[in-house]
Regions:
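Core alpha-helical transmembrane segments of integral membrane proteins
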Residues: 166, 171-233, 265-269, 273, ...
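Residue-level signature of catalytic and energy-coupling elements of molecular machines
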Residues: 23, 207, 231, 264, ...
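Terminal, Lys/Arg-rich, intrinsically disordered segments and adjacent short helical elements
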Residues: 215-259, 308, 325-371, 375-432
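Hydrophobic alpha-helical transmembrane segments of multi-pass integral membrane proteins
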Residues: 21, 197-206, 260, 267-282, ...
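Active-site-proximal binding-pocket segments
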Residues: 249-250, 254-261, 267-296, 300
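Compositionally biased, charge-rich terminal segments
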Residues: 144, 149-174, 402-412
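Conserved catalytic motifs of ABC-family nucleotide-binding domains
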Residues: 278-328
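Soluble non-transmembrane domains of integral membrane proteins
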Residues: 1-163
Length: 432
């Protein structure tokens, strides 16, 4: 009309998930600076766990300053945002697949909509409204329609691999996954095609690396076990006076050279690894569709029994890997209780509460993840029992007694001095 003509060309590359689109306007559009873009996509439900798939589906985007952001993941409400900064790329992300649009010339005045779908046929309803600036009356766009495969995504565009959620950047979880777990995972894939065996090998490698920390934790707990009778005697001596009991206990720790946190700190060192795996296994597409033992798909939950009803917070299926994980946690807690000073009050029952809570929490999680945690707990349990055979508690007791003699006239620590001052202040206040 009026001599106006739009030319649209597509280029499909062999062995690639990318499509290039070029749009050219002829001279009849000489007053046109921008093209309006509107893209709608309603991805079909693809995975076994519909709720989890919806929770993993959202819109991701990267602005011109390389700031990555996204709409709220697990929301059951309609989400939308207006973005003033120009954008480099936008992705409709599902759990294991994405549809993305990438522009070298940036998207302007973008509006993103993620609309909740109540049924099970579609995951969500995604909409993009944006403007693209014309350069010489043309624009070039790249589309990516493919898997959330880290190896592929990192080659597509700047920070495009962030479409795979590998954990928090701020506490180093994503960094650990990128530079430690993914290289280990890719290396182990060279030796076997069984992803169940790859998970087993990952556990062995990681347990080997952190064995010195596990051993240090065991030694610290063994010292606390030897010291426990004296701690109990102090508690009985100052029953009803917690401050005096704490002050004398701290003095005992100082004289014996035993740290009450010695057994905790090495264990805390392992927490980032467990958290990293929590994001790693469920988000790596390599596990999708991979069977192992009774699990048909390591990317979703395993089910050995379908229930004719739904248990609140549990579900309508029974995951055997989750049960095994819960049992392994109980074994770990029992061993730790034997090594540590006896617990009192509600803490005594905490060791039973945690496995039950994990049973409910992890029942619908990836079977690959619960299998990994089960193996990790069993490996740790085995290590601790091996350490028991090599740790001589009588030698530890002799070492503690020797430290007592060395430190009999040692000065109080600054913490002990402050604690004594606080006790005296409280006693003076009570006298008044």
């Amino acid at each position: 009309d009026n001599g106006k003509k739009i030319s649209i060309k597509y280029q499909i590359n062999d062995n690639s998930y990318q499509i290039n689109q070029s749009i050219t306007l002829n001279e009849g559009f000489e007053d046109t600076d921008f093209i309006n873009l509107k893209w709608k996509n309603k991805p079909y439900h693809q995975e076994l766990n519909t709720n989890n798939e919806k929770n993993q589906s959202t819109i991701n985007y990267l602005d011109e300053n390389d700031n990555f952001d996204y709409l709220d993941y697990p929301s059951t409400e309609d989400e939308s945002i207006e973005i003033s900064n120009p954008i480099k790329w936008i992705s409709f992300k599902q759990q294991y697949f994405i549809s993305s649009i990438i522009s070298n010339d940036l998207f302007y005045d973008s509006k993103l909509f993620s609309l909740h779908e109540k049924g099970d046929e579609f995951v969500k309803d995604f909409i993009i409204e944006s403007k693209i600036k014309l350069i010489n009356n043309s624009i070039n766009l790249d589309y990516y329609f493919g898997p959330n495969d880290y190896k592929i995504l990192k080659e597509i565009s700047t920070d495009f691999d962030k479409n795979i959620y590998l954990g928090f950047e701020t506490i180093g979880v994503r960094t650990f996954n990128k530079y430690v777990l993914i290289p280990i995972f890719n290396f182990l894939k060279n030796f076997t095609e069984s992803y169940g065996l790859i998970i087993l090998l990952m556990v062995i490698v990681i347990r080997f690396i952190i064995t010195p920390f596990t051993y240090k934790s065991h030694i610290s707990m063994a010292k606390m076990k030897v010291l426990n009778p004296e701690i109990q005697a102090i508690r009985e001596k100052h029953e009803g006076d917690m401050q005096k009991s704490q002050a004398e206990t701290m003095e005992l720790y100082q004289k014996t050279g035993v740290s009450p946190l010695g057994g905790c700190l090495p264990i805390l060192f392992q927490m980032p690894i467990l958290i990293s795996v929590f994001y790693f296994i469920p988000n790596m597409i390599e596990f999708r569709g991979q069977s192992f033992l009774w699990a048909n798909d390591l990317s979703t939950y395993d089910s050995i029994l379908r229930l004719p009803f739904t248990i609140p917070f549990y579900g309508s299926h029974v995951s055997l890997f989750t049960i095994l994980m819960a049992i392994s946690i109980m074994l770990m807690n029992k061993t730790n209780m034997q090594m540590q000073a006896s617990m009192e009050g509600p803490m005594k029952y905490f060791q039973y509460f945690i496995p039950i809570m994990m049973l409910f929490f992890f029942n619908s999680f990836s079977s690959g993840l619960t299998y990994y945690y089960f193996l990790t707990n069993i490996a740790t349990y085995g290590q601790m029992n091996i350490f028991k055979k090599f740790v001589d508690e009588s030698k530890i007791k002799d070492e503690i007694e020797l430290n007592k003699k060395k430190n009999v006239n040692s000065k109080k620590s600054s913490f002990q001095i402050r604690l004594d001052e606080a006790m005296k202040a409280k006693q003076n206040k009570n006298k008044k």
